[in-house]
Amino acid sequence: VRKGVYKEKVVIPESKISISLIGEDGAILTNDDFASKKNCFGEEMSTSGSSTCYIYAPDFYAENITFENSAGRVGQAVACFVSGDRAYFKNCRFLGNQDTLYTYGKDSRQFYDHCYIEGTVDFIFGWSTALFKDCTIHSLGDGYVTAPSTDQGKKYGYVFIGCKLTGVVEAQKVYLSRP
């Protein structure tokens, strides 16, 4: 993916196995939809419907891509929705506010390697098993970083190894996860 800002919705369907998106520095996928925004039928888009990028396919790989939801502080606004199994993100950026990264697939295993993830509230959330290795996780304000919905009986949910948790100076109370 060439350097540039691409304002669009990207969908990687389940049938497209082993897709790779490798970006030049500065490759940004962005959109500004949000959960309470009305669609063409006058219905709210919902959290899932607000995403900039949807990844349903297994064995997806992304490198040097920025996934952004630029809606601002308007409630839930997903940058990347990941449902496919064995998704691997290397040196990617996930930018948003509330609900930035949706690790959706209950049986999905996801790996985030040297990624940057930012948001305000519950900005990493969902059901998947996800490993975050050497990532920077940046809070833009007070709130919870993660809101996992790990099924009881699953061995792992979210695992963080060698990650840095950072935040804006104004943030007074930031918690790793909801109780």
Which residue ranges define each predicted feature?
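Sequence-level preference for short, compositionally simple segments enriched
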Residues: 2-179
